[in-house]
């Protein structure tokens, strides 16, 4: 894997191009990885994704917690001309393997001296460094993260944070020794919660490795995934990230998985982060929210979401977002998507995912354009206030509205309870 920085500014982060393997097209950074569950884009088939969201090859974010059951079959499927992306139905796309699903809250606890817990659909699995490398060898991803203990957040005690660093170092010692058996690029995990000393210790362990031991960094341990990433305090997060970035070399990409809000994402990019994922778009969709925040300068005050459970839109025949060119907005209306919610139709989350992914990918294109002209601070301020007088709240609250079976199929006639 090769990472080339094309533009670096003090106020606007950096533009780069990531070349993951020979023969594959380069990926422009800041890059938005496509989050998957069980090897699939949530709610979307490969055909729908490639025909109605984007035809451009993407970097797929796969998680071991949702595809661990595939390792045995993939050991027989993989060959010189077939890989993990081919197996899941996305030939031509690149992939990165992470441990935890950024879309769902990772349970706390279950940590042991010599194993890392992996929470799957079948329950908790015990993952030793040896077993992890065997699974990576079977799955053969293009990129994979090192095994780490990321069971920390802003409330974690100092003892728990230190244990996460010590256990990660122990795991990574084995990974570094045996990585030559895997023909994939390794990402070195940087853990340590919100403790600058612990983060520095984690960074030093990575920097002590021989040149070429890994191709980039993945920052873990800031949150427990799922909606927790949308509500974290950026005033605590950003100083820690800035502290870490100052100790890292420029020529390696930096990944921060999780459902960070658009505003926090922009602030992280300003500090030098490169790779993000679409888990925020997914979390919004499964909680019945269409993304409507603007990243194009105008004079109109905008809101971050459209709540499609709101009865106020049941007769609103405008698109989810004005001037959006996605399939959902071109072919359907707010009233129709609200009707799909009330009748519990599967097409509802499909249309929301199509719109949210399209909108978030356009957002990242706008980010790259703004960095190219050194305009990231202006874009950040627009996203922060949306032309209003105060900062917009991008956190996502879980939708707790329930539609009873008695009201299903009655469309606009019955209200959710």
Swiss-Prot record:
Residue numbers binding Zn(2+): 324, 326, 329, 355
Cofactor: Zn(2+)
Gene Ontology, cellular component aspect: cytoplasm
SUPFAM superfamilies named in the record: tRNA-guanine transglycosylase
Biological process according to GO: tRNA-guanine transglycosylation
Protein name in the entry: Queuine tRNA-ribosyltransferase accessory subunit 2
InterPro entries hit by this protein: QTRTD1, Queuine_tRNA-ribosyltrfase, TGT-like_sf, tRNA_ribo_trans-like
Keyword flag Nucleus: no
Compartment list: Cytoplasm
Chain's role: Non-catalytic subunit of the queuine tRNA-ribosyltransferase (TGT) that catalyzes the base-exchange of a guanine (G) residue with queuine (Q) at position 34 (anticodon wobble position) in tRNAs with GU(N) anticodons (tRNA-Asp, -Asn, -His and -Tyr), resulting in the hypermodified nucleoside queuosine (7-(((4,5-cis-dihydroxy-2-cyclopenten-1-yl)amino)methyl)-7-deazaguanosine).
């Amino acid at each position: 894997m090769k990472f080339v920085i094309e533009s670096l500014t003090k106020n606007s982060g950096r533009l780069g191009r990531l070349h993951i393997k020979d023969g594959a097209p380069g990926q422009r950074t800041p890059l938005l990885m496509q989050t998957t569950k069980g090897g699939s884009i949530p709610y979307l088939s490969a055909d729908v994704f490639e025909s109605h969201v984007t035809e451009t090859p993407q970097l797929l974010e796969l998680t071991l917690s949702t595809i661990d059951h595939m390792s045995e079959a993939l050991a027989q499927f993989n060959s010189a001309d077939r890989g993990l992306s081919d197996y899941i139905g996305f030939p031509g796309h690149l992939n990165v393997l992470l441990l935890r699903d950024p879309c769902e809250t990772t349970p706390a606890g279950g940590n042991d001296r010599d194993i890392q817990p992996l929470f799957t659909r079948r329950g908790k699995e015990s993952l030793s460094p040896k077993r992890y490398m065997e699974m990576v060898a079977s799955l053969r991803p293009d990129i994979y993260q090192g095994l780490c203990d990321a069971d920390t957040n802003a409330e974690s005690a100092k003892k728990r944070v230190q244990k996460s660093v010590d256990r990660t170092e122990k795991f990574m010692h084995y990974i570094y020794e045996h990585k030559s058996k895997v023909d994939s690029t390794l990402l070195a995990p940087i853990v340590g919660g919100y403790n600058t000393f612990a983060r520095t210790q984690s960074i030093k362990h990575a920097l002590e490795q021989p040149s070429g031991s890994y191709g980039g960094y993945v920052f873990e341990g800031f949150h427990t995934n799922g909606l927790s990433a949308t509500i974290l305090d950026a005033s605590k997060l950003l100083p820690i990230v800035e502290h870490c970035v100052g100790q890292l070399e420029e020529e390696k990409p930096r990944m921060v998985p999780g459902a960070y809000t658009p505003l926090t994402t922009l602030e992280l990019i300003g500090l030098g982060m490169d790779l993000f994922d679409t888990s925020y778009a997914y979390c919004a969709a499964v909680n019945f929210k269409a993304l409507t925040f603007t990243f194009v300068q105008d004079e109109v005050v905008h809101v971050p979401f459209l709540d499609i459970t709101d009865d106020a839109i049941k007769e609103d025949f405008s698109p989810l977002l004005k001037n959006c060119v996605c399939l959902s907005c071109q072919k359907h209306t707010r009233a129709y998507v609200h009707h799909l919610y009330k009748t519990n139709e599967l097409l509802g989350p499909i249309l929301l995912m199509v719109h949210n992914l399209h909108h978030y990918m356009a957002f990242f294109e706008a980010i790259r354009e703004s960095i190219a002209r050194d305009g990231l601070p202006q874009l950040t301020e627009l996203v922060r206030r949306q032309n209003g007088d105060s900062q917009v709240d991008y956190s996502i609250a879980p939708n707790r509205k329930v539609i009873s079976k008695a009201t299903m199929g009655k469309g606009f006639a019955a209200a959710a309870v």
